[in-house]
Amino acid sequence: MSVDTSSTLSTVTDANLHSRFHSRLVPFTHHFSLSQPKRISSIRCQSINTDKKKSSRNLLGNASNLLTDLLSGGSIGSMPIAEGAVSDLLGRPLFFSLYDWFLEHGAVYKLAFGPKAFVVVSDPIVARHILRENAFSYDKGVLADILEPIMGKGLIPADLDTWKQRRRVIAPAFHNSYLEAMVKIFTTCSERTILKFNKLLEGEGYDGPDSIELDLEAEFSSLALDIIGLGVFNYDFGSVTKESPVIKAVYGTLFEAEHRSTFYIPYWKIPLARWIVPRQRKFQDDLKVINTCLDGLIRNAKESRQETDVEKLQQRDYLNLKDASLLRFLVDMRGADVDDRQLRDDLMTMLIAGHETTAAVLTWAVFLLAQNPSKMKKAQAEVDLVLGTGRPTFESLKELQYIRLIVVEALRLYPQPPLLIRRSLKSDVLPGGHKGEKDGYAIPAGTDVFISVYNLHRSPYFWDRPDDFEPERFLVQNKNEEIEGWAGLDPSRSPGALYPNEVISDFAFLPFGGGPRKCVGDQFALMESTVALTMLLQNFDVELKGTPESVELVTGATIHTKNGMWCRLKKRSNLR
């Protein structure tokens, strides 16, 4: 559940149908053909030849950068300026271009989008400065502007004062007893999906009696929605097996959130847009359906509140509660004082941030495993040894080390989100980072900053063989003696942590952000992904239907596919 989610910005419109959203129209996204990670670097650079003279670049792109430089008062200190042409952004995800410019200009550079400039950061030293050391000098900037109409004062778009108050209330809800109860929900929902697959295997009309072909991205999307519904609201969407007006409204809202995060001009802020533009009218209708549902759930939770003693509430047995949801905890702990509107904003944030992240993580984990059969067999061997045919439990997750490493390695190669967005609230001096200016870079208040998680996770300066799928890499200490200001990777730096994090990597690995505004639901999302992947591999062998190159990548709030992740599933031979 990535509560600190953010997204790419785009100037390109591209209407596509995506089965993951149940045949809804998905515009304003980039798509790009993808292959195995080790081949990505050669593909992503094909539209940029850094040996070309700058004068040979697209004239419009150069003019755009010149205008940006003039309007922003020249370069920010001696910060390099990316002179990418507009054509560099066509037909490929933005973060691929950001990577190319990172290799060309360094870990901190200024990027022009018309008359607007952004600072792009691809260095853990600088990311640590922004996210942890100087966290309260930055807010979510343009991301908050985009998402406020949808999430209100939820954790993502909230101003700092509101965020501090809501964080104090919500963070205690993600305690170990709650997570242990959630693992039961994860397994129950995953079992529904496994049962659905088994029933399809028993049917007819597929390519053989022992296999079925499915869009696993769509299936993971439905699974993640059901888990969020039960774990956060105590509401069963049942989207694995059915549709309803609420489910359609949820997907419509998710779609609109993604649309707004990938469209550069916020036309929806025009007062008449909600009445004139058909998609905005539909969004208002979808939002009304969801808000009515959430208001009813909040009302029921308040009316059914029985225990008022805070100490007893904190000590109750979550495993045996009929309703162990986050909503139940927040209402019980705050009682009549809880504000319905703020609570609804919090729940909406959890719904949108939590759903997309998990579905994307599972999709890319399967994509990577399908290209590495030996690693899939190793994962299945671990599952067989630890669980046999049993269900995952909170305790058994601690023994499923390789599955956990697969999940985090998938997040390293395909971070969700690929960008974190911040805006400086006051002037600041960014560190120069690796190979940057020793005195750093002064930036004025109001500067929009892109922290490229994708660049951080694939940086050749901080990772060995950064494009390779190597789950075991997080077990190996990487003592850094060459890069001043970066402590290297050390698994012992975060004792007791089930999953690698920004602490062990000193901010070179940021799957859920870092610092005070780090995602509050990171363990929820990681455990959810681990359980779902475990149960899939426990029951099935998975192959890609086509070639890796046939999988087209689309970016919005997260990294997903253009036409689904079509795979061939076979019942494992030991279970037939």
Swiss-Prot record:
Secreted in keyword set: no
EC number of the protein: 1.14.-.-
Transit peptide interval: 1-44
UniProt-listed InterPro entries: Cyt_P450, Cyt_P450_CS, Cyt_P450_E_grp-I, Cyt_P450_sf, Cytochrome_P450_Monoox
Binding-site residues, heme: 519
Main location: plastid
Cofactor: heme
Compartments in which it is found: Plastid, Chloroplast membrane
Stored Pfam families: p450 (PF00067)
Identification of the protein by name: Cytochrome P450 97B2, chloroplastic
Organism per entry: Glycine max (Soybean)
